[in-house]
């Protein structure tokens, strides 16, 4: 399997390979795996994610945690999709609920977009963006038996700054994923779904899914309003 990660592509930063995604969701969809077989973890490679967004300015870069919709949960990788596909890229400024914190050249916002729970880092400086992300990371609970907090992350670079969307998670999959009969919906949301484009792998689900179903699914996998408020408070206490 490791040969897949070394096949012909564009090398990036000496230890990634930029490949065309063989199962695209976007009109232009890339996969960026680590060349070495290492675990899917964001903490040591968030700076790499910023660098990738800085180089691929026509793309939004995304990270799915190992139990947050990752297509290869046991191998470190990012994905990238062309900008203009996910509604959140254009919509987020209209959904700002407030400022969590200012830090150096960066601001951390939170959005009024329930049932999603969304934090947005806006930064012209790489080090400051990393510091804010680390603060968010350490403000999130880690589930028993897991190595990192559950989250999905989107990063794009525009107007000489990074925009980072962090979606903290409470749950891997909604109840409908394992439900029996008509209640069954094979929805396991990842970054793209949280960015506003819901993917249904099975046609029957595409036909029957409703706005209420989507709200229910997001409400289950994202934080509760009370937990989201606690996270924002923890962040402010650390800065």
Task: Identify the function of each model-found stretch.
Residues 1-5:
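Short, small-residue-biased leader/transition segments that mark boundaries at the very start
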Residues 6-26:
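Hydrophobic, conserved cores of late-appearing folded domains
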Residues 14-16, 28-29, 162, 194-196:
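A generic secondary-structure signal marking the coil-to-beta-strand transition
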Residues 17-20, 32, 80, 165-166:
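Short hydrophobic-aromatic micro-motifs
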Residues 20-36, 110-117:
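Residues forming anionic-ligand binding surfaces in small-molecule and nucleic-acid pockets
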Residues 39-47, 52-61, 66-72, 81-239:
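Conserved His + Asp/Glu catalytic blocks
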């Amino acid at each position: 399997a490791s040969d897949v990660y070394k096949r012909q592509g564009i090398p990036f930063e000496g230890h990634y390979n930029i490949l065309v995604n063989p199962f695209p969701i976007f009109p232009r969809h890339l996969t960026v795996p680590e060349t070495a077989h290492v675990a899917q973890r964001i903490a040591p490679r968030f700076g790499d994610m910023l660098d990738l967004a800085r180089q691929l300015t026509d793309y939004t870069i995304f990270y799915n945690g190992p139990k947050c919709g990752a297509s290869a949960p046991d191998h470190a990788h990012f994905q990238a999709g062309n900008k203009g596909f996910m509604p959140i890229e254009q919509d987020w400024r209209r959904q700002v609920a407030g400022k969590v914190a200012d830090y150096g050249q960066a601001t951390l916002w939170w959005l009024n977009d329930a049932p999603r729970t969304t934090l947005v880092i806006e930064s012209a400086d790489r080090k400051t963006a990393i510091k804010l992300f680390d603060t968010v990371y350490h403000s999130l609970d880690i589930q028993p038996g897991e190595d990192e907090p559950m989250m999905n992350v989107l990063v794009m670079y525009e107007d000489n700054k990074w925009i980072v969307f962090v979606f903290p998670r409470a749950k891997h999959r909604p109840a409908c994923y394992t439900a029996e009969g008509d209640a069954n919906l094979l929805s396991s949301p990842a970054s793209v779904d949280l960015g506003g484009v819901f993917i249904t792998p099975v046609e029957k689900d595409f036909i029957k899914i409703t706005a209420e179903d989507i709200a229910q699914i997001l409400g289950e996998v994202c934080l509760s309003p009370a937990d989201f408020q606690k996270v924002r408070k923890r962040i402010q206490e650390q800065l």
